[in-house]
UniProtKB/Swiss-Prot annotation:
Belongs to the small heat shock protein (HSP20) family. SUPFAM superfamilies: HSP20-like chaperones. Residues 33-200 form the sHSP domain. It comes from Dictyostelium discoideum. InterPro entries: A-crystallin/Hsp20_dom (IPR002068), HSP20-like_chaperone (IPR008978), HspG1-11-like (IPR051779). Residues 88-101 have a biased composition (Low complexity). This is Small heat shock protein hspG2. The keyword Metal-binding does not apply.
Length: 200
């Protein structure tokens, strides 16, 4: 025969499972299929007339930040890109474009039959391929990492506003991004809009 403690323990375990399932479903609802690599630091201050949210995002471009309010949750998300990798990709694209343009130039050059001496052409081609090989080896040498301590990738931060949302004027949201600090300011509603309860 089960004691009252066994019954209470079973009920408690069932409630915990239900609550955990609700939390997981909420997380899944707000999580995009991107991996979150960085959780930025945040300060939230409430003054008499506004709510101030400051988030540290050093090294992040202004264009890579997305701010949303959904179901009374403020979501700050984006991507901190590695500038070296971005630079390498741009250089690679430029080199591909230049190689394509040199291939087009080769089409404009006279054919081998029009050259008086075939040996000059072969020596020029050999020099060009040697120069390209030298450029590849020097670029691979310059990309060695000695120390790598900075973080890059996707970031996301949530702020639950459900307890104070009724006090805020969402039409007055103001954002600033300067020196790696994102500042979101939301004004409070004026006193005229506050709900006052009458005593009975």
């Amino acid at each position: 025969m089960a004691t009252i403690f066994d019954i209470l323990k079973t009920l408690n375990n069932n409630n915990n499972n239900i609550n955990n399932n609700k939390i997981e479903s909420c997380k899944r609802q707000y999580t995009v299929n991107k991996r979150i690599d960085i959780i930025p630091s945040m300060d939230v201050t409430m003054t008499n007339d506004k709510l101030i949210i400051e988030t540290e995002l050093p090294g992040v471009s202004k264009n890579d930040i997305d701010i949303n309010i959904k179901d009374s949750i403020l979501i700050i998300q984006g991507e901190k890109k590695n500038n070296i990798i971005k630079l390498q990709q741009q250089q690679q694209q430029q080199s591909e474009k230049s190689s394509q343009s040199t291939n087009n130039k080769d089409d404009d050059e006279p054919s081998i039959e029009e050259y008086e001496d075939d040996t000059k052409l072969k020596s020029n081609l050999n020099k060009n391929t040697e120069n390209k090989d030298e450029n590849k080896t020097t670029s691979s040498i310059t990309n060695k990492k000695f120390i790598s301590e900075r973080s890059f990738g996707n970031f996301k931060r949530y702020l639950n506003l459900s307890e104070i949302l009724y006090q805020l004027d969402l039409n007055s949201i103001n954002t600033q991004f300067e020196n790696g600090l994102l500042t979101i300011t939301i004004n409070k509603k004026s006193d005229n809009f506050q709900i006052k309860l009458k005593s009975i």
